[in-house]
Amino acid sequence: MIHLPFFDDRHRTLHARLQNLAPRFEPLSARAEAGEVDEAGRDAIRECATLGLCRLLVPPDFGGDGLDLRSLCLAREAVAAASGLADSVFAVQGLGSYPVSLSGNHAIAERYLRRVADGRSIAAFAMTEPEAGSDAAAIATRAARDGDDYVLDGIKVFISNATIASFFVVFARTSDASKRAISAFVVDADHPGLTITRRQAMVAPHPIAELRLANCRVPAAHRLGEEGEGMRLALGTLDFFRTSVGAAACGLAARALDESRARVQSRRQFGSPLADFQLTKAALADMATELDAARLLVYRAAWTRDTGAERLTRESAMAKLFATEAAQRIVDRAVQLHGGLGVERGSVVERLYREVRALRIYEGTSEIQRLVIARELLAPSPEPSAFAKASAFAKATADKSADRPSP
């Protein structure tokens, strides 16, 4: 159980409800390893919808529970501890639908978000290109206006959920006037001109592929926000979900720690349990300390956003950077504590070792997170951190409540 000061009763209730998800989700990872990647991905969304988790990704006006970041982080931590595949598919369900929530396009939101909330539709976020990874503004996919339509042409790569998606949010260049002249469009998976051209095999299998847009004619009504607002929507989405990547890292790390505690108490060498040796105790202590520190950064960032912060750039970057790097170290120690079993195909920690690696890359590499944090620190007139502002607001609210006479 997680005991942190950032939760209220609804978060504690959700956390208690999400304990022991392994029987639901862990078999999905095994099925993906056996080649049933798409089937396992679809079943992961069905399970998440059954648990009510997909509603966490959608505003209340469209059948959701309200985009509460602490709840999303609790969900991702619990799901990731059971299955990296299920976490990936669930996370991209949110990543691909959140720009619709941000855009203010009510007609599109009504059409797509209700089906996301109940799991009938699966979303994907199509931004990365062969020459546009960390440099997202280098997008080359074009969207040319033609009457009441836009015609999209380009290639997207490493698009998670691509092979099971019902729709994509596609980012494309609508002008050469500026590097940021990018717009976002909702494109149905079966829309003429959009094709999956190549599945991409990853060290931890999940539904991911390259897609091509060739003379793909999309109604202008499917544009999210104004023309040229795509980068704002993309960065706003990544700011929100980046914190939850840190939560997923905590889930993988917590599972690695649990597996290690059990292993060192049952495994005997030189006549004693491994848990009796000082080096083993030191490793466990370091793992637990790093996990707690990561959780504090993650749920601090989530609380900050839920308390009303408009920007979460610094806090979310810190949470993702530290949590994903700490998780890598924790899982690596778990492999070491398991010895040969730790690198045997089919063992839990071997799977965790493969699943944890991508977290330091997607939604902004660790190197990019460091640049983002440094940029915030070195700004000519750095503002107080979002956490400081949120804390001041919370304190002022509490002080006002304390000043009110008792009924």
Question: PLM ranges: what are they?
Answer:
Residues 1-81, 106-108, 115, 119, ...:
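Alpha-helical interface subdomain recognition
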Residues 84-107, 133:
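N-terminal glycine-rich flavin-associated loop
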Residues 122-145:
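A gly/ser-rich beta-alpha-beta helix-loop segment of oxidoreductase catalytic cores
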Residues 138, 190-219:
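Flexible, small-/acidic-enriched active-site or ligand-binding loops
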Residues 153-195:
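A short core secondary-structure module
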Residues 209-236:
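A short, charged helix-loop
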Residues 384, 401:
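Cationic, low-complexity basic patches in intrinsically disordered or flexible, solvent-exposed regions
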Residues 386-392, 397:
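Short Gly/Ser/Thr- and charged-rich N-terminal loops/segments
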